[in-house]
Amino acid sequence: MVRVCRFVDYCSFSLQGEKMKKIAISFSGGRSSAVMTLLVLQKYPDADIQITFANTGFEHEDTLRFVDACDRNLFGGRVVWIEAVINQEPGIGVGFKVVNYETAARDGEPYIAGVRKYGLWNKTNSSCTARLKVEPMQKYLKTKGFVRGKHLNHWTAIGIRADEIDRLSVNRLRDKVVYPLVEAGVNKREVLRQCAKWDFDLRIDEHYGNCVGCFKKSTRKLATIARDTPEYFEKWRMIEEELKDFKKQNNYDPATNFRRIYRKYMTVDDLVQIGSESGFRGFSSAEKDSQGYMFDDFDFETGCGESCEIY
């Protein structure tokens, strides 16, 4: 197990005498999140722990397989799969429904429903995480007695690693957010070493994580996906074409009179073009970790996999 002793020392702490009796875990479907979840479950077998996974319909199929495999092999079937329910009527908030590995959306249904109500999501209209993950999971947790706001009664465990401390929330004490991997000193290499022991480990590189075509990913990652597996962008192209008129004030391209999903008003076809150029150097996590190339504008990213959002 990854540095269990340091983790145990950390998880024995209390804040102003308050023990961690209720813990919410948002399982992202990634390796770091899996290791963190396992550690928390092992340390707190008697705590009221709720594990949720929010599916947007645009996750890679292997992410869904990994979530299911972790649940069956490590977490004792405790993961609750949540999907947003978007009511198109004005003034009605986001709901949720509980699904499972077999019934989970795989054609972008929750995401597309959200775009039809809230407009094309992009860098200036980036509420997709809130609408498709945060709100549905919080509403589910409320049905289990996990309350937020001024009556906050639980901790939230986040799978950020020790090599990602710049992502920690500045409001972590106020919001009762804990980072077990950070406090345990667990970095990416240690997470990979742990997951390599599992015969159900993820089989995709990191740029396929979260929503495959997410606008928050770097241009290099997106162009690499467009080059290697262009079929993943067919739905994104449909969204771009059919819903480009929604809320023009957000990421509005004055040259075309339409909104765009990607940075610098790029379209799906622009990403395909970049990936097809002879001099394009595709993304590789191994090369990135070894600093095999210098980072430039192609490598700038923010978002679900890079931000410090609670869920």
Task: State the predicted function of each range.
Residues R3-Y311:
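Nucleotide-activated chemistry modules centered on ATP-dependent adenylation/adenylyltransferase
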